[in-house]
Amino acid sequence: KLSDIAVPERALYLRTIMAELQRVASHLMATGAFINDCGAWQTPVMHCFRDREKVLDLFEMTCGARITTNYMRIGGVAFDIPDEFLPVLDKLVNGDLPFRFDELEDLIVGNEIILMRARDVGVVSPEVAINASLSGPMLRSTGVAWDIRKADPYAVYDRVAFDIPVGYN
């Protein structure tokens, strides 16, 4: 916006896809780290890291890097996606991940170690969350339905229909 450079439509969609994939990878890493910190390591942690690897494989397929992708550039993206990207992405988001998330939820929600160490710990009210400038999953976990992708959409988020995930701690 500052330099008045128009980003091609395809690049806007690719940016959105990559941002969402990074969000998934980040949430999987954070969830795995949380489980590990609670002492409930092994199965749930390995599930998180295994699924994160599948997302990182897509990054590597696209630009050769798994973590520091350096993909988004002024005016667009560094590379177009390879031909095999969309079939792998489709299998991941429409097959593997939904099943894995259900499986992971079952492993976490009923896990006695996690329940003993996390229940009623660090409960934050919506008012405190807002006053402390919490954002993202931390803010939404207090019941506040605010998401930057809806409040101030970038890329093509204004054209993507999604619900804001909200929890209540």
Give residue spans per PLM region.
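Active-site bordering "gate/hinge" segments
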Residues: K1-N169
